Amino acid sequence: MEGILIGDDDALEFYLKYKEDLFKDIPASFFGIYDKKNIERALKYKNVAGVREVESLDQIIELIRKHHKNVENIVFIDNDNRVKNEFEASEDNALKYSNLNFEWIITNDIVSDEFVHELKKVEENSAIISLYPIHFKDVKWLGYDDINKGIKNYTNQIPIYACLSYGITEGVIGGKVINHYNQSKSATEMLLKIINEET
């Protein structure tokens, strides 16, 4: 095996766990990874490179401000608290967005029926940023098409933005999105560079 392309956080976790036993001298490159600790661990190896996945929340919020002047509330919908914790830890965000209210719906903490209830409570002067809302307490995985249909049906024409290119389905405006094709291309180029330097 000449090299390994690693495509998400679970895959990188597996790679790091078994690196010494299975992948010791095999070059690797990752993409679609947002766990900073695992990225730091991986990059300690000389034959590992990669691309961190970073959501462009500032650009999406600016698009909302520009195109939806009535918006006072932004509701983030996400699997877990990772993005929320990073966003709320930034003092810059508190200053930049002092005129906006931010709310979070964390899907891992609720069942799908509760999700519908939370969506019905979203006020008309809101916009939604859909991050990674595909896991619930009672459902391990729902596709973005199903999630976005639900959001659209229960939020009464509130603008919906996404952070992933494949999160743009019917009813979703878009936004400054992450494109995993482009990330994988960059990661592949890095991997080839490592392989070619070693041979």
What are these regions (language model features)?
Residues 1-199:
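Short hydrophobic alpha-helices and adjacent helix-cap/hinge residues
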